[in-house]
């Protein structure tokens, strides 16, 4: 956390998010451009950080299972830290083109690591030997 900013570093895929917590609204609709993390704003409700995201692009997964969404997706995340060692997380998805009503997850509790972030990357050619086998298999079908 920095004054006016929440910076979320993720160990997976070396990704990060920068979310403004200074009370600014979302961009006007004519200025929105779909982005992987969307247009994000945040505010505090007591000890809970509430992140509001719209304008998510088609690459975004709502959860780790690959839940798809439309251009009307609206995600509200809630993060709180009941102690120095734990973080709690909950999210609500509103998407009138995909869901009949808003859906809210249960609260998840995460133990916060005391170690360093480990580099983790994802590429399409990480395992060259596996790619060679796939290529040979495809070639044998011709």
Where are these regions (language model features)?
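PEST-like low-complexity, intrinsically disordered acidic/proline/serine-rich tracts
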Residues: 1-142
